[in-house]
């Protein structure tokens, strides 16, 4: 069977003839400008065997694993090749178009709000002019600062997604901008755009780390602004049971938990006048 006789299944379910040149261009672009890497090594190491009906997403995943397997002390730059290949796949999945074609920030927000992914309150917090300005600040090329381990963690843990279907709704730079825009939405309107830009620059350039609950949930309907929560437990049954309920709710909101049980009486202390001994 020749390449022209092989059809691949695209992400939207349509079939198209296999284009080997397109596969090679993708690998070539992933290796561009990096020392000590080879497109042919990635392709050969993948052991990729094409068959009629193979999914384009599977082709990309095989190439990603191939580049990841080539990472070594002697060839560390394959970590960036694998990262780029993963980014190409991610962008194609999220945008549905060419990986370098990015939607406008406001269009992206409207789409995510409509799907119930982003908090509906964020839409009208900024004017159209402010959304335009925030969109102009986004530098999607900062995605290429990630190593493979870094971008894989972002994809698996922090990007907003439907974990039952695997559908991902945003890319790293949209995530960073929406975190910043959400955190400063209620600040003084004269200064907040500048604050958003500075914060976006700091987190998107990896100069500042964000706690997991905020990075993963602050822009969503969960509205998780707190990272770690301290729960004080008093020396009563009502307080102990209420604390258990609070802990459960905070954990469901992705918050980290700290418990202050210092008020609870010590071991062997009397309960109800000695009817029960505390253990």
Residue ranges and their predicted role:
Residues 1-279:
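Extended catalytic cores of very large enzyme megasubunits
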